């Protein structure tokens, strides 16, 4: 199943794009032709606040992280932001008249917003060249029953960019453009060809959910509680907090590995879990023929139990505590190595 997942993602990346359906070079040409329009009520404050990263909080929100994954020759940049329901303007939806009350659907709350996103290249900490402007109309939905205006949710939007350093300017606006929230976020996307001395990976995350679609998205869309990558809809763990008995469903891509003559890879990976400096779990070494790794790891310890002169082994769930997940990667073709550490918590 996991090998199939890796193949599906690689096919999706090679044959299409992870978000926009066409390479960044073509998108830049369309930008030059003026096919994306940001109204001046939004664009002027976006541009004015870029140099000092001066946020505008008519609609409060915050960009709190980004991920990136390979997309053709580019990198799929994924921005994560969070906002309260009340700040996004949720209101009761007008339901159609239904003759039979038994057919009535659960009443909904809707929020209709316009998102505008700019990417500028960055030199010496300052935005230099506008690479892309994106407009994303969005309608969010929530059940009216149990709706909490103070509840905070997280959202994502992704776009493929060539390697480099960027400033993302994200504006969220009401439909009448009278309320506008603006935030700025700097991100760096690596060049896969630059890893010649050591291996590295994309940011490692742990999956909580996965859904495969029939085709990748042709235009960027706003997603709540998940992100889109090729034909996949992935729900990652945001806080890296797991319950006793949960698995670490890890997902990452390895940079710097070289294929063999037949096109496949020869990658050795050791996975370990540490509690402080103490080794808590050492998983069996893994051999991989693809640089994209998606693998569930059961958080179970094999313990040696001594009672008098008797000894026995017992398998137990990893107990509650703070841990570090360690990934040690070696490319058997080039000899290059790399290591990644990710903190997580079991409760």
Regions found by a protein language model. Give the residues of each.
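Bacterial N-terminal signal peptides
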Residues: 6-15
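Intrinsically disordered, low-complexity terminal regions enriched in Ser/Thr/Pro/Gly
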Residues: 21-347
